[in-house]
Amino acid sequence: MELRVIEKTDTELRIEIAGEDHTFMNVLKGVLLETDDVAAATYDMNPEQSGGQTEPVLTVKSESGDPLDVLAEGAESITDRTGALRDAVKAA
């Protein structure tokens, strides 16, 4: 997975996440929307200016915090959830 920051302000981040598809991006977006400091989270697989299919571009808007910190918190939440699922499957 390769990340490329397209645009970043104090409360907004646009970042390309190379090598991912709708499956991962939907999970990431969903987790971000459950995060307290997130005002908005969305992604686009086909940005208007691209002229066609591109790598997904994630947009995160925070209420007040650094959007990179919010993204890191979302990634940590995914790690925790998949770990809990793995443990439950092993225990089954």
Swiss-Prot record:
Catalytic activity: RNA(n) + a ribonucleoside 5'-triphosphate = RNA(n+1) + diphosphate
Alphabetized Pfam families for the sequence: RNA_pol_L_2
InterPro entries assigned to the protein according to its UniProt record, in alphabetical order: RBP11-like, RBP11-like_dimer, RNA_pol_Rpb11_13-16kDa_CS, Rpo11-like
GO biological process, one term: DNA-templated transcription
EC category name: transferase
Alphabetized GO MF terms: DNA binding; DNA-directed RNA polymerase activity; protein dimerization activity
Keyword set, alphabetical order: Cytoplasm, DNA-directed RNA polymerase, Nucleotidyltransferase, Transcription, Transferase
Annotated signal sequence range: none
Chief site of localization: cytoplasm
Gene Ontology cellular component annotations, sorted alphabetically: cytoplasm; DNA-directed RNA polymerase complex
Entry keyword GTP-binding: no
Protein EC: 2.7.7.6
Cellular localisation: Cytoplasm
Known role: DNA-dependent RNA polymerase (RNAP) catalyzes the transcription of DNA into RNA using the four ribonucleoside triphosphates as substrates.
Subunit details: Part of the RNA polymerase complex.
Similarity comment: family membership: Belongs to the archaeal Rpo11/eukaryotic RPB11/RPC19 RNA polymerase subunit family.
Protein name: DNA-directed RNA polymerase subunit Rpo11
Species for this entry: Halorubrum lacusprofundi (strain ATCC 49239 / DSM 5036 / JCM 8891 / ACAM 34)
Gene: rpo11
